[in-house]
């Protein structure tokens, strides 16, 4: 008897996944050390889904730089210590028969918030409490009362170049960390979404002003990441702007 399509293997760019039941990326806000390094908690979390039989496990939104984190308690891939910790997790998932991708992202103007756990009261974490000044396509804060009045730095040419380099470097680190695929986070009102949406990107230079300008950064990031890794690459754009 043929198994249902859901439980049949799927091969994409040379990566064979054991079935089509995939775990989507879900932010955990569980790095209490606030250094971006995943812990034993993450090992158990992702390992349990591999034991449960998921095909591709997509690790949570992982920042390409410290200032790209949604909260100070997010994971990252900007240094070697993070690579080593992730490698322990990817090795475990592979030993359990699973495959694992990582969602690389930058929160942009929605960065430096409290962790979104039960009891979250909203608000941006200020620099004096371990936060930082977020960046965005303009100096306008994100929508929502938790962001009201919080300062944002508009990215200049050097800042945009750094964003592209950060994605490229993080993707290279993802390969060393043992990830089988990379997802570029382009949704949910985070930085790349902020650039391609006309609601948040009101720039008048070559990184805005019209459609081609607004999609320039997401495409540049995709090109940089594609050139840095040999494995499967995909992205997650947003179909609506309600999360900006």
What residue spans do the PLM features occupy?
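Structural preference for long, well-ordered alpha-helical segments within the folded cores
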Residues: 48, 92, 166-173, 181, ...
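N-terminal capping/small domains of soluble enzymes
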Residues: 2-105, 114
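Single conserved hydrophobic/aromatic residue that forms the stacking wall/gate
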Residues: 234-237, 241-244
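Active-site beta-loop-alpha junctions enriched in small/polar residues
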Residues: 26-28, 105-107, 187-189, 240
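Active-site mouth loops of central-metabolism enzymes
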Residues: 28-40, 75-77, 149-165, 240
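Non-globular sequence segments
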Residues: 105-177
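Polysaccharide-binding and catalytic clefts of secreted carbohydrate-active enzymes
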Residues: 154-155, 162, 183-219
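Alpha-helix-loop-beta-strand connector modules within alpha/beta enzyme cores
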Residues: 79-96, 202-233
